[in-house]
């Protein structure tokens, strides 16, 4: 009877591991290759530079923005997690992490460069950003033009410290996470979760790194070979008992 149970388990393992789980990375940039990074980003305003394997924005003026280029974004993506590391260098505030961006971005008194072609042709504008350390670095909040803002918190940003920033975007909601701690989750079905991501600053110099956007299946490739070897070791141990 024991042998029969083990054989059944072997068959189940083989059935499960015939399907390989793939990673679902939509976009990523670690800025190791400036020439490649130049293709991935479209700066709208500010002094954006690829240096020291990071993406720097060095102008101390409001509304400095850069979005992912057309070639690296699929407008159908409406369910994604966006992660980035941020480090504020100097200035008045912290970070502006853009998501759900479509159409023309708010100029806010600045002469923005022409946006990516697809964004330029999108009739209805939509813009979200997680304002971290905003209002003179006194608080944080998701602001939205065309959708629903929220996620108010007392989070401020310390210059020179690295921050792990994550936004989980779905067609019905978005959740913002700072240094692995969930800050807030906001229900928002107004725009179905569509729109690309970007980076921005407000009267602040900052640098960004390790940008990744991935789908619901996650960013890591699950190795079926590792699963088989681990499970077989367990089965072998039982056979020897």
Residue ranges and their predicted role:
Residues 34-66:
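Extracellular glycan-recognition surfaces and repeat-rich motifs
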């Amino acid at each position: 009877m024991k042998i029969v149970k083990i054989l059944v388990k072997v068959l189940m393992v083989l059935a499960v591991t015939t399907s390989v789980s793939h990673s679902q990375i939509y976009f990523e940039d670690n800025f190791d290759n400036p020439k490649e990074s130049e293709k991935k980003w479209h700066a709208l305003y500010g002094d954006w530079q690829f240096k020291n394997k990071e993406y720097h924005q060095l102008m101390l003026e409001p509304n400095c923005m850069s979005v992912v280029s057309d070639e690296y974004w699929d407008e159908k993506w409406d369910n994604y997690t966006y992660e980035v590391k941020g480090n504020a260098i100097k200035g008045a505030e912290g970070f502006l992490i853009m998501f759900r961006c479509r159409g023309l971005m708010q100029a806010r008194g600045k002469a923005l460069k022409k946006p990516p072609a697809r964004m330029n042709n999108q009739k209805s504008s939509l813009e979200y950003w997680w304002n971290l350390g905003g209002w003179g670095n006194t608080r944080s909040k998701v602001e939205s033009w065309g959708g629903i803002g929220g996620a108010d918190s007392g989070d401020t940003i310390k210059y020179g410290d690295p921050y792990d920033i994550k936004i989980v975007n779905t067609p019905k909601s978005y959740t913002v996470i700072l240094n692995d701690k969930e800050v807030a989750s906001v229900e928002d079905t107004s725009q179905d979760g569509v729109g690309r991501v970007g980076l921005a600053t407000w009267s602040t110099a900052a640098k960004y790194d390790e940008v990744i956007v991935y789908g619901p299946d996650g960013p890591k490739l699950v190795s079926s070979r590792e699963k088989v070897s681990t499970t077989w070791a367990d089965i072998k141990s039982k056979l020897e008992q």
